[in-house]
UniProtKB/Swiss-Prot annotation:
PANTHER family: 30S 40S RIBOSOMAL PROTEIN, SMALL RIBOSOMAL SUBUNIT PROTEIN US4M. The gene is rps4. One of the primary rRNA binding proteins, it binds directly to 16S rRNA where it nucleates assembly of the body of the 30S subunit. NCBIfam families: PRK05327.1 (NF003717), rpsD_bact (TIGR01017). One of its GO terms (cellular component) is small ribosomal subunit. InterPro entries: Ribosomal_uS4, Ribosomal_uS4_bac-type, Ribosomal_uS4_CS, Ribosomal_uS4_N, S4_RNA-bd, S4_RNA-bd_sf. It comes from Narcissus odorus (Campernelle jonquil). Residues 89-150 form the S4 RNA-binding domain. Part of the 30S ribosomal subunit. Contacts protein S5. The interaction surface between S4 and S5 is involved in control of translational fidelity. This is Small ribosomal subunit protein uS4c. It comes from the Eukaryota. Keywords: Chloroplast, Plastid, Ribonucleoprotein, Ribosomal protein, RNA-binding, rRNA-binding. Gene3D superfamilies: Ribosomal Protein S4 Delta 41, Chain A, domain 1, RNA-binding S4 domain. Its main location: plastid. One of its GO terms (molecular function) is structural constituent of ribosome.
Amino acid sequence: MSRYRGPRFKKIRRLGALPGLTSKRPRSGSDLKNPLRSGKRSQYRIRLEEKQKLRFHYGLTERQLLRYVHIARKAKGSTGQVLLQLLEMRLDNILFRLGMASTIPGARQLVNHRHILVNGRIVDIPSYRCKPRDIITTKDKQRSKALIQNSIASAPREELPNHLTIDSFQYKGLVNQIIDSKWIGLKINELLVVEY
């Protein structure tokens, strides 16, 4: 199954807020999901919606998500927490969290078009897993810097997670450590995803 390219607001209305999917917001409260209309929700539906939230927020295919769950099960610690740490340490997500891109799909495009360097080397794989002490910069080309500058200028000033630091004048970001669970940007019950 390929990456989702359809209408994003339909997904937001059904699943709730997905900050990584789009930077736009619904105009009225009626655009968000209506809990009265949906009736009784089965356990299967609850688990499926949590999984879909994760998929659409991070822009993953079904196969990619299953691969991440498989890796998380093998690792030590809580499978759900390890899964979220793996997803949060992806290069496209880190660019989004640093404010270098307005959405995760926008960050994917920056990486695919070779505008991003990690530790001085071009990385064109959005799923690249960043490690502590990785330095993320842009190419020296004017076009690359202009794209990042526009994103940083237009991004709303949210509190930066403590595992990241950014120097907005040099267009440079630094991964300090692996993310702590309280800084994860999506409100989700990860245990339901693992159970699904």
